[in-house]
UniProtKB/Swiss-Prot annotation:
It comes from Ovis aries. Glycans are attached at residue 45. This is T-cell surface glycoprotein CD1b-3. Gene3D superfamilies: Immunoglobulins, MHC class I-like antigen recognition-like. One of its GO terms (cellular component) is lysosomal membrane. Residues 223-232 are cytoplasmic. GO terms for molecular function: endogenous lipid antigen binding; exogenous lipid antigen binding; lipopeptide binding. Its main location: membrane.
């Protein structure tokens, strides 16, 4: 009984048990029990091991529990078979989620004016998964001091959103860029330029492409006119 171990009511017993998957796919199971906030005993290699903090009570407890091999067999089965099987099942079910990679989208905007002659540059990054991401305001290859990162916010589709801001003088904004590093991008970082460089593509689409279409239409009109005159 409890009197044999000199336990007095009331007392607090704490315990933790589980299994861990280590590198090389080795699974280590454990069970540790505490008494009154101190380490008491642990189950290792199919046997009860008293902890030094447990003193003589822990030693007597292990002697006592060893007499009941049925109890140790149940504990051993739970630790060596049931727990690892459950762990591998959970990992297998969540493998797709663990390896899930979703590329981020990024865009730039300006925030509320910090003061006269100053701009608040905002780099938005959204739709990425997993959560770890690095977003930097850069000038060339130099990361800019004063970059402020907001909280990473969970989207409705379980991807993430982040905004990173930089307060600069209006005359110093040209040439700055926002760089996004994420595991889904590999070595292909997203780089968005503030100012004119970011509009080069829009200029091409808005001016060059319509001009080409106009030239093609004129060429077709002249060709049809020439063909008609040839027939006559």
């Amino acid at each position: 009984g409890l009197q044999e171990f000199q336990f007095e009511y009331p007392f607090v017993i704490q315990g933790i048990a589980g299994c861990e998957l280590h590198s090389g796919k080795a699974i280590q199971s454990f069970l540790r029990a505490g008494f009154e906030g101190l380490d008491f005993v642990s189950i290792e290699n199919h046997s009860c091991v008293p902890e030094p903090e447990g003193g003589s009570e822990a030693q007597w407890f292990c002697v006592f529990i060893t007499q009941y091999q049925g109890i140790l067999a149940i504990i051993d089965r739970l630790l060596s078979k049931t727990c690892p099987r459950y762990l591998l099942g959970v990992l297998d079910a969540g493998k797709a989620e663990l390896h899930r990679q979703v590329k981020p989208e990024a865009w730039l905007s300006s925030g509320p004016t910090p003061g006269p002659g100053r701009l608040l540059l905002v780099c938005h990054v959204s739709g990425f998964y997993p959560k770890p991401v690095r977003v930097m305001w850069m000038r060339g290859e130099q990361e800019q001091p004063g970059t402020q990162q907001g909280n990473i916010i969970l989207n409705a589709d379980w991807t993430w959103y982040l905004r990173v801001t930089l307060d600069v003088a209006a005359g110093e904004a040209a040439g700055l860029s926002c760089r996004v590093k994420h595991s889904s991008l590999g070595d292909q970082d997203i780089i968005l330029y503030w100012g004119h460089p970011m509009y080069i593509g829009l200029i091409f689409v808005a001016i060059i492409v319509p001009s080409l279409i106009l030239l093609i239409c004129l060429a077709l009109w002249f060709w049809r006119r020439w063909s008609y005159q040839t027939v006559l």
